């Protein structure tokens, strides 16, 4: 799973290699394919919320039940790789679940770019105690704060807030909020949309009540009607099958399906190497900010000046005819691979009997 790089050197290495070899490099950020995020992205792209000016995302997940299950480097490793990494590194070291979906909604490097950030963290209380419990020794310095907040300002004057907290007993939360000039979307802790009656009518949905306003979330029936009208085309295609297959509720399956679909049809991938670098670089940039009294830190332009060339984030689709041709070709390749696999498996079975 994510992230793909943990510092600027690794981010630039992946960008440079992708450009040098002209090969795709996609970050497997499954949260971009969750139902609420995809439907809300479609609404934002259709102007339901007006202009989106602020967004929030997070990874808030108490890892207390999981610390002892991460890979350990031998019997003497009392911490495991993840707790040790948090001990040694400050900043948002797991930003992409929260940042990825909101970056798409704000057209990052497709008309806008993240320009500067300021990061702040709490002191480490839980982190230090976890180390001391496992090692039996005092922990003098646990770099990662119990809760980290990063504020980002974009070139076009938008603001993104990203939070990271794997220590405190908060319920699981990725936030995912979009604040627009005409509407609001919120996923955690309660899914809801806030639109006034005029804006809901403008979006093509007739409200169930006459006094609908944006001071609270809309009634359930109005929300269901809005979601039905703006159901994302990708969910229409893969949604039901994804629920059957599963994988984080099905979003893993949708992500994998889109990766295969784009490769089969020769299309740009949903997330490119520049997304990867922009989302992952938050870790080191936030660390730089906090280590310098929470100073503003500039984002590198991984696109080398091309961030405004593409206008608006979009998913790529093939024509029905091209889809059909690609699918038939894929079926033939799959059949050959299955046939080859069956022969090899039979040969291995014979060898094993000997």
Model regions and ranges:
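Short glycine/serine/proline-enriched coil/turn segments at secondary-structure junctions
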Residues: 63-65, 168-171
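C-terminal helical cap and adjacent loop that interface with cofactors, partners, or active-site loops
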Residues: 103, 171-179, 186-189, 194-354
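Active-site beta-strand termini and strand-to-loop segments that position acidic
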Residues: 150-156, 180
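Short catalytic-loop micro-motif centered on adjacent basic/acidic residues
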Residues: 1, 25-29, 161-163
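Aromatic/hydrophobic pocket-lining residues that form π-stacking "cages" and hydrophobic walls in ligand
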Residues: 14, 40, 285
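A short catalytic or substrate-binding loop motif that flags glycine-/basic-rich loops and adjacent residues
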Residues: 96-97, 141-146, 154-155, 169-170
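Predominantly a Rossmann-like dinucleotide-binding segment in NAD(P)-dependent oxidoreductases
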Residues: 21-26, 31-142
């Amino acid at each position: 799973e994510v992230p793909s790089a943990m510092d600027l050197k690794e981010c630039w290495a992946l960008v440079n290699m992708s450009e040098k070899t002209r090969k795709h490099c996609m970050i497997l950020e499954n949260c971009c394919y969750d139902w609420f995020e995809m439907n809300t992205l479609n609404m934002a792209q259709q102007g339901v919320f007006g202009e989106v000016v602020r967004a929030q995302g997070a990874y808030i997940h108490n890892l207390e039940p999981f610390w002892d299950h991460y890979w350990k480097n031998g019997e003497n490793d009392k911490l495991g790789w993840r707790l040790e990494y948090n001990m040694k590194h400050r900043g948002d070291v797991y930003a992409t679940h929260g940042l990825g979906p909101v970056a798409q909604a704000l057209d990052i490097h497709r008309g806008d770019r993240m320009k500067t950030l300021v990061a702040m963290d709490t002191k480490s209380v839980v982190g230090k105690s976890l180390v001391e419990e496992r090692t039996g020794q005092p922990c003098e310095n646990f770099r990662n704060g119990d809760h980290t907040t990063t504020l980002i300002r974009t070139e076009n004057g938008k603001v993104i807030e990203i939070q990271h907290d794997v220590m405190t007993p908060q319920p699981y939360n990725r936030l995912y909020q979009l604040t627009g000039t005409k509407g609001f979307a919120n996923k955690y802790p309660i899914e809801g949309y806030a639109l006034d009656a005029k804006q809901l009518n403008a979006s093509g949905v007739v409200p169930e009540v006459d006094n609908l306003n944006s001071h609270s979330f809309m009634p359930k029936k109005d929300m269901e009607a809005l979601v039905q009208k703006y159901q994302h085309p990708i969910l229409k295609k893969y949604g039901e099958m994804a629920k059957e297959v599963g994988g984080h509720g099905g979003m893993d399956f949708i992500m994998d399906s889109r990766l295969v679909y784009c490769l089969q049809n020769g299309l740009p991938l949903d997330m490119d190497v520049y997304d990867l670098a922009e989302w992952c670089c938050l870790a080191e940039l936030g660390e730089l900010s906090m280590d310098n009294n929470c100073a503003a830190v500039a984002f590198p332009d991984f696109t080398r000046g091309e961030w405004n060339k593409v206008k608006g984030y979009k998913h790529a689709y093939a024509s029905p005819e091209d889809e059909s041709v690609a699918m038939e070709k894929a079926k033939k390749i799959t059949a050959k691979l299955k046939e080859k696999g069956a022969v090899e498996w039979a040969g291995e079975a014979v060898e094993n009997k000997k």
